[in-house]
Amino acid sequence: YSKDRAYAFENQLNENTGSVMVKRLQDYRKPESEAMIPMMVFAPTIVNDGRRLLISPQPISYLTTHRNDSNFNFKTTYDEVEFSDLFREQQAGNIRFSSVLRMNATFPYILPAVSLPSEPMIQVMDAGIRDNTGMKTSLRFLHTFRKWIEENTSGVIFVDIRDSHKERPIEEQPRKTFIENITTPLGNIYGNLLTIQDYNQDESYEYAKAWLTSPFDFI
């Protein structure tokens, strides 16, 4: 593997932060299991097929399956892969924590995609391509443990920390050239990718109120 600018970026980040993140992923397993720190789930996007690569110090294979408690027969696709299972032979838990952060935040064009030692080789990029605010992961976790949550907690609060407003004004489109008329529709779809995610996640959030009986609030 070549030492590209992403590798240099990670090393510089560790130097600037006093090497506080130069730990192995598995070093966080015990603090998480003892509730000393929050549970972390990272989900960079696999460039090859668009699925999400779920990374956590804890086993999280339950997040890669769609639990169906009804008799409705539907053949679903699996859109998540568990990192620790896929790279079990490569001792996945020994990956550097700062490398996990870099994979999760590899924004297109800013940093090159991260290549991983699978067969065939897969590349991953920013988690925001599929789930920019983590709502998809959070709702799946909530759905998996909803019965335990209903019996053992007083409710659920989602805290959404954003860098932009959810509602954006419609931009006025000036008169365009012939080439711009061809390229603008595709460019607008790409530019509104996060807005489309907001629409889908708001819908999922509303549906969650139907299958969770505990108090449920969003901040």
Question: Could you describe each region identified by the protein language model?
Answer:
Residues 1-219:
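Catalytic domains of lipid- and phosphate-ester/thioester hydrolases
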